[in-house]
Amino acid sequence: MLQTYKDQLPDYAKDLKLNLTQVLSESPSSELSNQQITGVALAVAYATRNRQLIELIFQKAEAELDESTLQAIKAAASIMAMNNIYYRFVHLVKDSEYQRLPANLRMNIIANPGIDKKDFELYSLAVSAINGCGLCIDAHANTLIKAGFSKHSIQHVIRIAAVLNGLAQVSIIENKT
C-alpha cells in the first residue's frame, strides 16, 4: 500500500516521495527502531488530521505494533492536541502571570501511558512539532536527551513530522483529504 501511495504522488511531490522512503527507514545515525519510527509516523498522521495519511500509516502500524502501543499513540496525539494549545498560549502571551497559574487540566496519561515512557515522549515530540508548541517541543526533546536519545534521533522524529506534514499538504492540494 505504501508503494502504491508513493507511485500515485504527483511529480511536484517527488522530493517528499523520496524523503518518505528515507524517514520511514532505520538510520545508522539514529537509534530509533522500526517500531518507534512507525509509531512516530502514526502519531504525526493523527496530528495532521489527514484521513489519507492516517489510513496509510495505520495499515503499516497495525501490522507492526501491539494494541497497547496503538492506544498510546492515539492518547499522545489527543493529549498533545490539548496541551500544545494551552502551553503555546502560556509561552506566547506577553503576561507572565499565566506561567504561574496552574493548568488545571487532567493529563495523567503522560505519567502512565501504558507503554515505555520514552516511546510516548517520541510520539509527543512529533505531535508537538506538528502543532507548533515551542515550549512542549523543548520539554519533550530535553526529556528524550536525558533518557539517552541522541540529537540525531530527535532530528529523525522531526524529519518524519516534516515529511508527513508536507504530504498532508499534497493531499489537500489534490483534494484527497
Swiss-Prot record:
Disulphide-bridged cysteine pairs: 133-136
Q: Which reaction does it catalyse?
A: N(6)-[(R)-dihydrolipoyl]-L-lysyl-[lipoyl-carrier protein] + a hydroperoxide = N(6)-[(R)-lipoyl]-L-lysyl-[lipoyl-carrier protein] + an alcohol + H2O
* InterPro entries reported for this sequence: AhpD, AhpD-like, AhpD_core, CMD-like
Q: Which residues form the active site?
A: 133 (proton donor), 136 (cysteine sulfenic acid (-soh) intermediate)
| UniProt key word Zinc-finger | no
One GO biological process from the UniProt record? Answer: cell redox homeostasis
Molecular function in Gene Ontology = alkyl hydroperoxide reductase activity; disulfide oxidoreductase activity; hydroperoxide reductase activity; peroxiredoxin activity
Recorded hits in SUPFAM superfamilies, A to Z, give: AhpD-like
Q: Does the keyword Metal-binding apply?
A: no
Question: What does the function comment of this entry state?
Answer: Antioxidant protein with alkyl hydroperoxidase activity. Required for the reduction of the AhpC active site cysteine residues and for the regeneration of the AhpC enzyme activity.
Homology family? Belongs to the AhpD family.
Protein name according to UniProt? Alkyl hydroperoxide reductase AhpD
Taxonomic source organism: Coxiella burnetii (strain RSA 493 / Nine Mile phase I)
